[in-house]
Amino acid sequence: MVCVPCIIIPLLLYIWHKFVQPILLRYWNPWEKKDDDGNVIKKGPDFPFECKGGVCPFVPGGKKTENVSDDDAEESENPPLNATAMAAETEVDESKKEI
């Protein structure tokens, strides 16, 4: 036979989390986000997938691209013409790394 506290404690915890705690947190919530002055921040975060300026950054079911690195794709599309062009390209890459 199951002991009485093994039934009562889970039942009380369920009632607390589902009914009592949400009501109490409306009036007293020490975990609410606050600004530097201690005022409660009412505004939630913006939805990251809003269409601004007529352009949607996220299109569900849009084009799926393969995971190919950009450097490999650029080299295969635009191969260097000669050794001088290749040397100049490596110098530019090295200067970018130094900065």
Swiss-Prot record:
What UniProt keywords apply to this chain's record, in alphabetical order?
Answer: Phosphoprotein
Q: Is Oxidoreductase set as a keyword in this record?
A: no
Q: What is the effect of changing D72N?
A: In strain: Usa7, Z36, Z50, Zim7, Zim10, Zim13, Zim15, Zim16, Zim18, Zim39 Zim41 and Zim42
The record's InterPro entries line, in alphabetical order, gives: UPF0729_C18orf32-like (IPR026776)
The root-end lineage is:
Eukaryota, Metazoa, Ecdysozoa, Arthropoda, Hexapoda
Taken from the record, one Pfam family name reads DUF4512
> Which chain positions lie within coiled-coil regions?
none
PANTHER family recorded? UPF0729 PROTEIN C18ORF32
UniProt name for this protein: UPF0729 protein CG18508
**Where in the sequence does UniProt note compositional bias of the Acidic residues kind?**
68-77
